A protein has these predicted regions:
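Negatively charged, low-complexity tracts enriched in Asp/Glu with abundant Ser/Thr
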Residues: 1-26, 60-126, 152
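Short beta-strand micro-motifs in enzyme catalytic cores
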Residues: 34-38, 99, 141
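Flexible loop/turn and low-complexity linker elements, especially glycine-anchored beta turns
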Residues: 167-171, 176-177
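Residue-level signal for functionally critical sites in structured catalytic/ligand-binding pockets
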Residues: 3, 32, 155
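Short acidic DE-rich linear segments
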Residues: 2-3, 176-181
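Short edge beta-strands and adjacent turn/loop segments
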Residues: 25-43
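Intrinsically disordered, low-complexity regulatory segments enriched in Ser/Thr/Pro
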Residues: 44-70, 76, 106-166
Length: 181
């Protein structure tokens, strides 16, 4: 078993133990700093959840386990919000390596499909976007939702999405404080 496979198995076990609704299926290694990130699925909803720890260069197993354990309630809150509000949506939470964007680079919009369901987005300005993105750099996350009809849009950001912002901010704050960054 390679070192990458050993790390993947060890950290996957810790994450899945902490968050039973998360299953991990991929591992990424940053060749420059030797740190890892893991990607998997949130069960019961369409979407993906990535606990990306590259930004913090976490290599100590005990520290990693402490962070996962201490932030369990925050991630559960995020899961509850997504499950309640976005069960019919396709949601992806990722950390794209190539994208480091400040909040002021984004525009806000709500897209409605023919049934009246809301597809909430915060997206970078694309010329012809059928897939629009919500991205916040709180623990490096992005949420993308496919808009069924992007001709219908509103400039208002609903309160429930602000709840998700708050969870990201809290998770970022907790990890930052834990690592004394």
């Amino acid at each position: 078993m390679s070192h990458k496979e050993e790390v993947f198995k060890k950290v996957t076990g810790m994450i899945e133990e902490a968050y039973p609704f998360v299953s991990i299926d991929k591992c990424y290694r940053d060749e420059l700093d030797g740190s890892y990130s893991f990607r998997g699925a949130i069960n019961l909803i369409e979407g993906e959840f990535e606990l990306d720890l590259r930004e913090y260069q976490i290599k100590d197993d005990h520290l990693l386990k402490d962070i996962i354990t201490k932030n369990k309630d925050v991630v559960y809150k995020l899961y509850d919000i997504i499950s309640d509000e976005y069960l019919d949506y396709t949601i992806e939470i990722v950390r794209p390596d190539f994208m480091y964007v400040r909040d002021d680079k984004f525009k806000y919009g709500i897209f409605l499909d023919k049934t009246g369901k809301k597809y909430v987005t915060v997206h970078k300005v694309f010329e012809d976007a059928t897939l629009v993105s919500f991205y916040k750099q709180h623990v490096g996350v992005r949420m993308t939702i496919t808009a069924a009809d992007e001709s219908k849009r509103s400039a208002n950001l609903p309160d429930d999405l602000n709840d998700i912002f708050d969870v990201f901010k809290q998770l970022r704050k907790n990890i930052t404080e834990e690592l004394n960054l």
